[in-house]
Structures are given as structure tokens and as C-alpha cells.
From Swiss-Prot:
Gene field: Mical1
Function according to Swiss-Prot or TrEMBL: Monooxygenase that promotes depolymerization of F-actin by mediating oxidation of specific methionine residues on actin to form methionine-sulfoxide, resulting in actin filament disassembly and preventing repolymerization. In the absence of actin, it also functions as a NADPH oxidase producing H(2)O(2). Acts as a cytoskeletal regulator that connects NEDD9 to intermediate filaments. Also acts as a negative regulator of apoptosis via its interaction with STK38 and STK38L; acts by antagonizing STK38 and STK38L activation by MST1/STK4.
Organism annotation: Rattus norvegicus (Rat)
Record's keyword terms, sorted: Actin-binding, Coiled coil, Cytoplasm, Cytoskeleton, Endosome, FAD, Flavoprotein, LIM domain, Membrane, Metal-binding, Monooxygenase, NADP, Oxidoreductase, Phosphoprotein, Zinc
Name of the molecule in the record: [F-actin]-monooxygenase MICAL1
Family designation: Belongs to the Mical family.
Length: 1047
């Protein structure tokens, strides 16, 4: 067997090339290798075959085997699929290089231009399972021996670029460094082709290069002309990245990485951080690679308070500009946060140096993310067609905590290469673009959970990666505007079609709503709906609507003797409590007919939720989407407040009692009171427009005003509480607690029981969200007068009447205390090993070659990754992790121990990514709602103004306002669903922490003190409460899933 240090100098060049850790070293060693072998670089696949033929010793052969295995996939057709295709790739980032590799494997000629001359970015990227397998298949372990050797799967951008650069060079990609692509140069005449405009003046070979495919991977700030970019904006979010020198000492290697800590479910960590350092964060991540890499999201007020930002400026670019950021304070901020997160175990933190020799710490803005409206275009001039495709950040900017940049970037690179293959096969332009856009629709929805589980089968063909693939989701007619024949003009036609489509879409909005209301209320005596004002004044139409949608709640016979105001107020309450329809106007306004716009907005909620429900159905219907989720969250919120009030009443107090909240709804206003209470925010006293109205228990606020008293965070259903001592609202993190006794009596938010779905027997009336000014009186009951004496609201009475009284003899006995989770873990572990036979360490020959040993270890890791066992339950997973860390027996099974540790970290990362995605989307929804509110305010002012505007114009404004209301309804739908998931994540984290705490105090009964028993009992009660809450949540989700299944 040949030795790399033998007489063949090419072996030395190859080993230097493989081990090179700087961009310039890679290029120089590869040029030396090509000279030694007499091969011209940049020659495509023929160059690769020449190099492989002359380097046949063991170290090189292991790499060739991997690359050949990839190239043998059917989609590449042995490198003959695109032999006549010429491609230009812009950008040598990870996605650009990955696209270049795929195009080279297809046999295309690939030229890549990059404006930089070296790789210097230390930031660490999280990797999805398929990206790990993909990079291993390209020889990642050969080029970078520490690739994914820790408990977290990640790699620095610089190392990723280096290994992909080496593969691209071996496959014959021609790379030009230090040149910037500035635009396209169309063919001047028939018979010529497309060229690139490049700065500075390129060599003749590059300047004259004509290509028919352009793949742009130039980053988010560069998108070729013709593509439309859409901004996805959220609340202000300031990210901070910091890279510290990794000395690779024993102490540093033992510091655990942090897959992600998010405030959305782990508030104690951030409270401790704030108390110890004064730093207020939303999240923090710590990875170890070439550097110690930290990334975190900081709050603006904290940065201002600690002097990191000099002053508060309205524009984000100015706020985070060099002139407004204090470098020394920023470094101190990042160092303190990193030191606290790692408990000071990294010792003295020294910043790594960036490309300019400065400390590698930066503050950046990810308030908004850019996304291209389309992923590809085709331009044609003088008969020459050019296919343009986007990959990487210029296609979709990633959200850093989720690890989506590399994963979706690689997927986009595969999809773009597949598009080029189809282009080379002669697929028609519109058909090709339709297929590409169908794939693009899937990209933003992809996650490790909804892709094919077997990552070993992933290839260029999209069917190997995406389950339930539909390449005809987008039709050719929908992508005609992406095919640009530059000799013709389509812009005006497209604009006219768009305007006509908008007008047609909105023209039937109010008419459709009115017709639907007429259908739902038809047949009820005394009800005739003809408009959005007087037809609803007596309350009968609204009661009829509620009765039709959910029979049994509002019987028409019960309306006898009720005033219009009482009937309307009753219907509003029942719709809120039983259907989840939040009011946007008061009962007075409905009766007076003074706010038809508000009534339209309110009725549109019914229409959105029940428009697909047959109005002739006699079954009790349940709303889909918003109302079902809001109904559940509303019950949770009332349960939270009711339990706190109960604890306060049971707690003896020697001081002056705080203002108590009534257990019945606020008093109904008299018919003589002035209507329009919903027009003014009860917190700021300013005017409320329809789209701004946020209702809590009959009181109206601006969404921006309804925030935490302490941190000013937006409050959402299920995530806040009202403190009776001052009447203010707080997020659960800052909700004032009474004392430990109250906490033990389940008074804290974490002990609140989630309402059981469909349970209408445990709900009391809501409490007033503001300190009451006058004593509350009960809602008049529509039943017998004697009922009024017990001061029950109508909703409470209805729930009480639906109770099924059964004897207690059939009630199950109290649950037994659970067995130790550690015992369950040990049993699970034993059963996992059953049937394996005797486990022995593999017999390794003493004279094995080092390269063969490394190859065998790498194959073991790949097999372990490809054949993952099915996921375990959360509790068992955590217990197995504890056992893996603490049990001496696990040393006998290092593979299992490594697998358990990795899977536990993966579960942490999944929760973190899910929480961050939710937080990001909630911020985007909030920003979108503010924009809708601004637009709606302008339209509402125009509609309410006494002006001489023609009726046609007013009707158009009304339709536009209804469209905005419907958009807001959709956003509220999504927000409610996300808040359900927030509850799920929070309960999972609480159960994990309580389970860990319970294991820590669980010991032999003879060794327990009285304090131990009390602590164990307290933790056990909390744990059982959380389990019950999770059970209620799962039951709710299952019931909703069954409702949504097609009959």
C-alpha cells in the first residue's frame, strides 16, 4: 500500500489540500496538486476522473468512494444529465458552493464568482439530520475530523465553506475570487448569449463567458433584477453574536453546550440572569467549534440602561449604527451574559478576532426578514433564454435560532439543481417554473419532523425528500409573469389583471355576509334581517344566530319579558363564553344601531368560524380555528383568575383587604346610558377604532395598551393575570405572588388547572379587568325571577342546569404516588437491551491502518444516524439521559450512552426551535395587526365622515374595511393556535423540571425527614397538576382533530 510520504509528490499535495484550514492554503495546495498531476483545474467532471485515476492510495480512495457513491445516484445519469449546460453561480457561501457541487455532478460546466478572498466568519450553524448525512457523504469527516463529534450537531460557517470548497474544486468547478457580480448583460443580437457584468475588470475568459443558467447565492442584500422581495416584519428584535477564543483545554471541553434557552418556557433562568447581571434577554444559545459561539436576543431598554446604546432612535439602522453602539459596553454585555450562562466555567473569556482584526462581537437587527416572492425566473431576448434561480439568504433569510439557514439553503440548492436538470431535458418554460414554485411553497414549511425520516435516501429528486409531494400545486397560468420575453411588455397587463381581481374579490363581501346572516336566522319568529343596524336592535336576531349555531344555549321562548338590551347582552356573553366569539362592540351600540361598522366586524367573526357549517343541522356544532382555540384559552384565563381569587379569599389577612373582584359579569348598562363605551380605551382614554378594539370581559382596550404593568410585554389569552391588589394586568412572569403558603395552595400561575374541553360546568362569570368603580349587579336571567336572588349570571345558570349529578360511589380512588421515574428508566433501559445477546467490544486487529480505523468509526456513526430508533416519551427520554450520565453500567455501552445524550440534546433543540419560531411568528402577527389597524383607522374615518363622497366610493371603502377585518380574523386565528402550542411547551418544560426536582428529593422512606416529606408532597402535587393540565390540552387537541376530519 502506498504511503502519503512516498516518492509521489502528489500525495503530499493531496494531504496538504485535505488538511488545509485557510482558504488561501486550500487554493494553493490544490493548484500544486493539479501541477503535480498535469491536470488543468476547473475542467469539470473529466478533471475529477483524471485526479482520481492518479491518486489511488488508501487515504485518497476513501474519499473517492464517498464521492463516487453520491455521483452514482440515478438522477445524475453518470454525469451526463447537463453536459451542454453552462452555469454561473454567484457567491461562495455554503449554499452557493452546495449548488455548484450539485451542478458539477450533473455534468454542467460551472463557473463561480466570489467577491471575497478568504473565509473569516466564525459563527456556528445548527445542522438538521439530513445535512449531517449529506456532508458526511461528501467526505466531511475526511476534511474536518471534529465534524459533529459533540452532543450538538453544528459546524462553523468557515469550516463548512472550506469543506464544500474542497469538494467543488475536486469536481472541477471554476472559481474566480475577488470579483463582484453587478448585473446581467443581455445578448446584443441573435446568436449571442447572456453574459455577466463584473467588477473589477475580469480576465478575458470570465468576461466572455456565456451561460444559460444563473444561480444567485449572493446573500440577502443581493437579489437579481426582476425578483420581488417581501418583508416579513415583527417587533424590534436585537441580536448579539459573540465569538470567544477556544483554547481546547480540558476545562473548556467539559463545559456543556446550550442548545437554546427561550423565555417563552424557561423564565426562571432569565429572572436569575436579570437579578445577577442586570441583563434582560429573550433567549441565548451556546455552541462550541473553532470558537465559543454565543448568540442571544437582548431587549432594547436593557441595552439603553446598560449603556450599550447611546440613545433611543426610531429607525433601526440608526439605533444599531456604529455611531450609536458603544463597543466596550457591548463587549462587557456579551461577556457577562456568556459567563453567567456557562456558570463561569470557561474562565477568562477572550474575544476572537474578526476579518478586520477587531473583537468578534456584533449587534444586529432581525426585526424583519426578507423573502423572495418567487424562486426562479426565465428571461429571453433575441431567442436566447436565461434561467435564473435563487438559493440561500437571497431566497429566504433564515431566522438564526432555528438552524434553517443551512438546512433550507441546501434544500433550495437541490431544488435549483433539479430545475436545471429539467431545463436541460427540454421542459417547457412555464411548466418548469410551475414545478419550481410548487417546491418553493414547501420550503418554508419544512422541518426535520415533516420530511422523510430516512435521510440516507435523500437525493436530487424532490420525491426522495418531501413526502406527499405535489409538483402541480402551482399551475403554469399562475407563473406567466415569471417568464419575461424582453421584446414584449407585460407590466401594464399584469397590473390591470391584479386590480380587476382585487375589485372582484371584494365586491361581494358585505352582501355575502348579509345573505349568510339571513340564512342563519331564517324561520325564527319576529326576526327579519335586512341590514346591519335596525334589524339587530331588539336582540332577537343575535339570539337567533347564536341558537342556530349552537342549539340549546338560547331558546327563543326564554326571551319573553326581556328588554332588547338584556337580550343583546345575554347573546354577547353566551357567544363569548360558549362559542369563543369576542365582542368588538357593546350591547348598547347594537341596540341603538349606532355602530353598523362595528356590527359588521362582529358578525364577520361568526361568518369566518361557521360559514362551512350547514345551517339546517340540528347537532351542536363546534367552531373551527379561532373560536375553538380562543374558547379554550378563555376558559384557561378565567380558571387562572378564579383560582387566584379563591386562594386570596381563603388566606387570612390582618391588613386592609384589597379590592375584591365580583364573581359575576359587570352590571348591564341601562337603556338610557349613552352608547359608545367601546369607542374609548379604558386604560389610556383615547379613541378606539374597530380594528384596534381588544375586548376583555366586556371592557375595550387598544392592543398596545393591554400589556404587562412591569415589562410592557403584550398580553395574550392564557398568558396573563390580574392582581386584585392594584387591579393591573401582568404577564405570568411578573404577576405578583402573595406568599409561599398561597403557592402551596395552588395560587401560583403554574398550578392552574387547564379547563377540560367541552366542560361547561366549572366556569364562573369573568372578573372585571379594571378596578370596579361601582358595585356590580347581576345580569338579568331570562328564566324564573326567583333565580335572580342567588346572583348567578345567565351563563352560570345555563352551565349549572347542564350538570349531571351522579353518585360518588363510582369515582375512582385518588391516584397512587407515581413510582420513581429513575426506576422506570432503569426498566426501560433493561428492556431495551433484551434480545441483543451479550454485548462485546469489537475485536480490532492490532495492525489496522489508521485510515481504515477512522473510516470504520465514521461508518458506525453514519449507521447510528441513519437507523434511529423511534422517539421515546419525554419522561422516559429525560430519565434515560439521567441514567446515561450517572450510571456506571452505561460505560459498558458507549454507543447507547452517546445516542441517548445526543437524542436528549436534540429534543432540547427541537423545543427551543419551536419556541423561537412561535415567538417570531407572534411578533410578526403583532406587527401585521398594527399595520391593519392603521389602514382600518383611515378607512373608518373616511366612512364615518360626513362627506360628499359618492355612494360607490363609500361602498368600496366598506368592502376594503371588511377585507381588513377578515385579514385580522385570520391573524387572530393563527395567534390563538400558537398560544395553545405555547401552553403545551410551557407544560412540557414544567413537567421536566418538576420530574427532575422529584428525583432529586426522592430517597428511602427511612431516611426522610418531615421537611423532606413536605417537599416531596408539594412537588408531587405540582407534578400531578401539570400532568392533568397536559391531559386536558391533549384532549382538546384530539377533539378538535376529530371535528376537522372529513365525514
Amino acid at each position: 500500500m502506498a504511503s502519503p510520504t512516498s516518492t509521489n509528490p502528489a500525495h503530499d499535495h493531496f494531504e496538504t489540500f485535505v488538511q488545509a484550514q485557510l482558504c488561501q492554503d486550500v487554493l494553493s495546495s490544490f493548484q500544486g496538486l493539479c501541477r503535480a498531476l498535469g491536470v488543468e483545474s476547473g475542467g469539470g467532471l473529466p478533471q475529477y476522473h483524471k485526479i482520481k485515476a492518479q491518486l489511488n492510495y488508501w487515504s485518497a480512495k476513501s474519499l473517492w468512494a464517498k464521492l463516487d457513491k453520491r455521483a452514482s445516484q440515478p438522477a445524475y445519469q453518470q454525469g451526463q444529465a447537463c453536459t451542454n449546460t453552462k452555469c454561473l453561480v454567484v457567491g461562495a457561501g455554503p449554499c452557493g458552493l452546495r449548488a455548484a457541487v450539485e451542478l458539477a455532478l450533473l455534468g454542467a460546466r460551472v463557473v463561480l464568482v466570489e467577491k471575497r478572498t478568504k473565509f473569516s466568519r466564525h459563527n456556528v450553524l445548527h445542522l438538521w439530520p439530513f445535512t449531517i448525512h449529506d456532508l458526511r457523504a461528501l467526505g466531511a469527516k475526511k476534511f474536518y475530523g471534529r465534524f459533529c463529534t459533540g452532543t450538538l450537531d453544528h459546524i462553523s460557517i468557515r469550516q463548512l465553506q472550506l469543506l464544500l470548497l474542497k469538494v467543488a474544486l475536486l469536481l472541477g468547478v471554476e472559481i474566480h475570487w475577488g470579483f463582484t457580480f453587478t448585473g446581467l448583460q443581455p445578448p446584443p443580437k441573435k446568436g449571442s448569449g447572456w453574459r455577466a457584468r463584473i467588477q473589477p475588470s475580469p480576465p478575458a475568459q470570465l468576461a466572455s463567458y456565456e451561460f444559460d443558467v444563473l444561480i444567485s447565492a449572493g446573500g440577502g442584500k443581493f437579489v437579481p433584477e426582476g425578483f420581488t422581495i417581501r418583508e416579513m416584519r415583527g417587533k424590534l428584535a436585537i441580536g448579539i453574536t459573540a465569538n470567544f477564543v477556544n483554547g481546547r483545554t480540558v476545562e473548556e471541553t467539559q463545559v456543556p453546550e446550550i442548545s437554546g434557552v427561550a423565555r417563552i418556557y424557561n423564565q426562571k433562568f432569565f429572572q436569575s440572569l436579570l437579578k445577577a447581571t442586570g441583563i434582560d434577554l429573550e433567549n441565548i444559545v451556546y455552541y462550541k467549534d473553532d470558537t465559543h459561539y454565543f448568540v442571544m436576543t437582548a431587549k432594547k431598554q436593557c441595552l439603553l440602561r446598560l449603556g450599550v446604546l447611546r440613545q433611543d432612535l426610531p429607525e433601526t439602522d440608526q439605533l444599531l449604527g456604529k455611531a450609536n453602539v458603544v463597543p466596550e459596553a457591548l463587549q462587557q454585555f456579551a461577556r457577562a451574559a456568556a459567563d453567567f450562562a456557562t456558570q463561569g466555567k470557561l474562565g477568562k473569556l477572550e474575544f476572537a478576532q474578526d476579518a478586520r482584526g477587531r473583537p468578534d462581537v456584533a449587534a444586529f437587527d432581525f426585526t424583519s426578514m426578507m423573502r423572495s416572492e418567487s424562486s426562479a425566473r426565465i428571461q429571453e431576448k433575441h431567442g436566447a433564454r436565461l434561467l435564473l434561480g435563487l438559493v440561500g439568504d437571497c431566497l429566504v433569510e433564515p431566522f438564526w435560532p432555528l438552524g434553517t439557514g443551512v438546512a433550507r439553503g441546501f434544500l433550495a440548492a437541490f431544488d435549483a439543481a433539479w430545475m436545471v436538470k429539467r431545463w436541460a431535458e427540454g421542459t417547457g418554460p412555464l411548466e418548469l417554473l410551475a414545478e419550481r414554485e410548487s417546491l418553493y411553497q414547501l420550503l418554508s414549511q419544512t422541518s426535520p419532523e415533516n420530511m422523510h425520516r430516512n435521510v440516507a435516501q435523500y437525493g436530487l429528486d424532490p420525491a426522495t425528500r418531501y413526502p406527499n409531494l405535489n409538483l402541480r400545486a402551482v399551475t403554469p397560468n399562475q407563473v406567466q409573469d415569471l417568464y419575461d420575453i424582453m421584446d414584449k411588455e407585460h407590466a401594464r397587463k399584469k397590473s390591470d389583471e391584479t386590480d380587476a381581481r382585487k375589485t372582484t374579490t371584494g365586491s361581494a363581501g358585505t352582501e355575502e355576509l348579509l345573505h349568510w346572516c339571513q340564512e342563519q336566522t331564517a324561520g325564527f319568529p319576529g326576526v327579519s334581517v335586512t341590514d346591519f343596524s335596525s334589524s339587530w336592535a331588539d336582540g332577537r336576531a343575535l339570539c337567533a344566530l347564536v341558537h342556530r349555531l349552537q342549539p340549546g344555549l338560547l331558546e327563543p321562548s326564554e326571551l319573553q319579558g326581556m328588554s332588547a338590551l338584556e337580550a343583546t347582552a345575554w347573546a354577547l356573553r353566551v357567544a363569548e363564553y360558549e362559542l369563543g366569539i369576542i365582542p368588538v362592540l357593546s350591547a348598547q351600540a347594537v341596540v341603538a344601531g349606532s355602530d353598523p361598522l362595528g356590527l359588521i366586524a362582529y358578525l364577520s367573526h361568526f361568518h369566518s368560524a361557521f360559514k362551512n357549517t350547514p345551517h339546517s343541522s340540528g347537532l351542536v356544532s363546534q367552531p373551527h380555528g379561532t373560536p375553538s382555540a380562543i374558547l379554550f384559552l378563555g376558559k384557561l384565563q378565567r380558571s387562572l383568575q378564579r383560582t387566584r381569587t379563591k386562594v386570596e379569599e381563603e388566606t387570612p389577612c390582618t391588613e386592609e383587604p384589597p379590592v375584591s373582584e365580583p364573581s359575576v359579569p359587570p352590571a348591564l348598562p341601562s337603556e338610557h346610558e349613552e352608547a359608545g363605551a367601546e369607542d374609548v380605551c379604558e386604560l389610556c382614554g383615547k379613541r378606539l377604532y374597530i380594528l384596534e378594539r381588544f375586548c376583555v370581559d366586556g371592557h375595550f382596550f387598544h392592543r398596545g395598551c393591554f400589556c404587562c404593568r412591569t415589562c410592557e410585554a403584550t398580553l395574550r389569552p392564557g398568558g396573563y393575570g390580574q392582581y386584585p391588589g392594584d387591579g393591573y394586568f401582568y404577564c405570568l412572569q411578573h404577576l405578583p405572588q402573595e406568599d409561599q403558603k398561597e403557592a402551596d395552595n395552588n395560587g401560583s400561575p403554574e398550578n392552574q388547572e387547564l379547563p377540560t374541553p367541552g366542560d361547561s360546568t366549572t366556569q364562573s362569570g369573568p372578573s372585571s379587568p379594571v378596578p370596579p368603580v361601582t358595585e356590580a349587579s347581576p345580569v338579568p336571567s331570562p328564566s324564573q325571577p326567583a333565580r335572580r336572588l342567588i346572583r348567578l349570571s345567565s351563563v352560570e345558570r345555563l352551565r349549572l342546569s347542564s350538570l349531571n349529578i351522579i353518585p360518588d360511589s363510582g369515582v375512582e380512588p385518588p391516584p397512587k404516588p407515581p413510582r420513581s421515574c429513575l426506576d422506570l428508566a432503569q426498566e426501560s433501559l433493561k428492556s431495551s437491551f433484551m434480545g441483543w445477546g451479550v454485548l462485546r467490544a469489537p475485536q480490532v486487529p492490532e495492525a489496522i491502518e489508521k485510515g481504515e480505523e477512522e473510516e470504520e468509526e465514521e461508518e458506525e456513526e453514519e449507521e447510528e444516524e441513519e437507523e434511529l430508533p423511534p422517539p421515546l416519551a419525554l419522561e422516559v427520554e429525560q430519565s434515560l439521559l439521567t441514567l446515561a450520565k450517572n450510571s456506571g453500567d452505561m460505560t459498558k455501552y458507549p454507543t447507547w450512552r452517546r445516542t441517548l445524550m445526543r437524542r436528549a440534546k436534540e429534543e432540547e433543540m427541537k423545543r427551543f426551535c419551536k419556541a423561537q419560531a412561535i415567538q417570531r411568528r407572534l411578533n410578526e402577527i403583532e406587527a401585521a395587526m398594527r399595520e391593519l389597524e392603521t389602514e382600518g383607522m383611515k378607512l373608518e374615518v373616511a366612512l364615518r365622515k360626513e362627506s360628499s363622497s359618492p355612494e360607490k366610493q363609500k361602498k368600496l371603502w366598506l368592502e376594503q374595511l371588511l377585507q381588513l377585518i377578515q385579514k385580522k380574523n385570520s391573524l387572530v386565528t393563527e395567534e390563538a393556535e400558537l398560544m395553545i402550542t405555547v401552553q403545551e411547551l410551557d407544560l412540557e418544560e414544567k413537567q421536566r423540571q418538576l420530574d427532575h426536582e422529584f428525583r432529586g428529593i426522592n430517597r428511602e422512606e427511612t431516611l426522610k425527614t418531615q421537611a423532606d416529606r413536605l417537599s416531596e408532597d408539594r412537588v408531587l402535587r405540582k407534578l400531578l397538576d401539570v400532568v392533568n393540565q397536559r391531559d386536558a390540552l391533549i384532549q382538546f387537541q384530539e377533539e378538535r382533530r376529530l371535528r376537522e376530519m372529513p365525514v
